[in-house]
Amino acid sequence: SAALLGPAALASTMQTSTNARYGMVVQSKGKVTRIDKAGNILWQYECGYNSHDIRMLPNGNVLVTTQPSVIEEITPDKKVVWSWKGKAVAPHDGPIEIHSFERLDNGNTIISESGNKRIIEVDPKGTIVHSIALTVEKPDWHRDTRRVRRTDTGTFLVAHEGMGLVREYDKTAKVLWEHKLELGAEAATPGANGHGVSIFNVLSLKNGNVLIGGGNNNRVYEVDRSGKTVWSIERDELKTVDGKAIHLCWVTSLNVLRNGNLVFATAFAGPDQPILVEVNRKKEVLWAKYPDTTIGDDVCAFWLTDIKGSVIR
């Protein structure tokens, strides 16, 4: 296992970003930052906003939300070559927030719009070529959705933050499957360090199961299609290789590596807790990255850049 670099070691290594292990693009402190596996800052773009999704495209550009309702594709020389601004569509007349997007191989972009309660596919010219109306019983322009991810069968898994549940939709907007988050034994509490059912992320795994980044449910867990939990990482279950307790707060991005390891983000846990953690299926912590002056404890979106093989994210 790799040695972990805890907070006490940060003072002497502040010039870049500490204990990177992987190259990555991260949104934190209102900046998009690309670092190499040594932690050297390769590129930084200041936008004053923290995105809930991020994508490093094959052409080297970065796709990111730079305002609550704006997605931009940014080149390495910081030119914006494509953008989308969400606008209210009747009957909705309030704000729009974009928490999830994906660039398709055909050049189109999948976008989820909270407020409009829809998933849209937009071509490079900005024309909507397909739209899926989401079923949202408790509309909230900030919380209708978090991450939305396509499956290999062409359906969409949607994390409905405000309702604390996952729904799977087909292209006709039919709900095929649903899973509701539970509080468990812990009562609901407010705040960044609180506990609830505000789901953030959802991924379709190769075995057909669904992996959930619970947001303030403070855990990662895998469910089968009957809704049974078959694997989980609970809030205070993990320890670093040197025995220090890891306390999960807002569990956000998930990257499942080819070898089955999981790299995930946990936000708002404070300066003494990791922001990125890699675990294997035995729940052994292989690596953890702590906040530093470049990347803080507010990470909701990261993208590993130098990983061999396919990554589910």
Language model region names:
Residues 12-313:
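Histidine-/acidic-rich catalytic cores in large beta-rich domains
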Residues 1-11:
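N-terminal export signals
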